[in-house]
Amino acid sequence: MKALSAIVRRELIAYFSSPLAYIVMAAFLLLQGALFALIVGYLSQPGQSSMSILQAFFGGTIFFWFFLVVAPLITMRLVAEERRSGTIEILLTAPVTETQVITGKFVAALVFYLSLWLPTLIYVFIVKTQASVDWGAVAASYLGVALFGALFVSLGLFASTLTRNQIIAAVIAFTGLIVLFGVPLVRGLMVSSTWLAAAVDHADLWQHMADYSKGIVDTRHVVYELSLTGLFIFLSTKSLELAKWR
């Protein structure tokens, strides 16, 4: 446990001492603020959707574009940079396992990712001053944010174990996220296979987040996201083990 906490602490220090981290945080909050202002302005117009502001904020399409960019940026250096600089060999000669290294890096990246979302709580209280807030839906929305973050960080971490180049790692992660988001597009091609179409519907991340934003927590969605997260952490560990012997 001490080894794991040491790795988490090491990675968090690396994050918060990097100029890129603050650039990502500033850009993320600026875009989130702009999105919130646009949603408030749009829904305040007469005759617009009865959807709540927070539901539109968390369940809207633009929400996903943040993930496509942010997740690769915060994970691309995790292993790729250490492999390039040779520090991964030094780390693995310490009394730690590959599993501890991967888990520690995953936890640190997830903590950093979640820290990006903490300031958005301000928007919840802004809405509360003007209208009633469904706290169940708010809690479910942030649960969705955390689950999606865990999934996308684990995918980005896996991408980072596959190369020594941070940019290539980011491109691989970005491509992987496009594939995950693109699952619903396959739905229209499955006319005859009802069971396959149902499976695709179950893997529709857009619908998952739309449900979370409404306060609907489907355990199948939770299991799906946690299962994929576990799979990518497992693959990251195995990839690091293979890299150790190259």
Residue locations for each model-derived region?
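Aromatic- and glycine-rich beta-strand/loop motifs that create alpha-glucan
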Residues: 1-25
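Hydrophobic alpha-helical transmembrane segments of multi-pass membrane transport/permease proteins
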Residues: 19-41, 62-71, 175-179
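Hydrophobic alpha-helical transmembrane segments in multi-pass membrane proteins
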Residues: 22, 26, 65, 108-125, ...
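Secretory targeting signals
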Residues: 34-37, 54-59, 107-167
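Terminal transmembrane helical anchor/hairpin motif
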Residues: 41-54, 175-239, 246
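Long, hydrophobic alpha-helical segments
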Residues: 58-81, 116
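Short alpha-helical transmembrane interface motifs in multi-pass membrane proteins
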Residues: 60, 68-73, 108, 136-141, ...
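Helix-loop-helix units of permease transmembrane domains in multi-pass membrane transporters
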Residues: 78-108
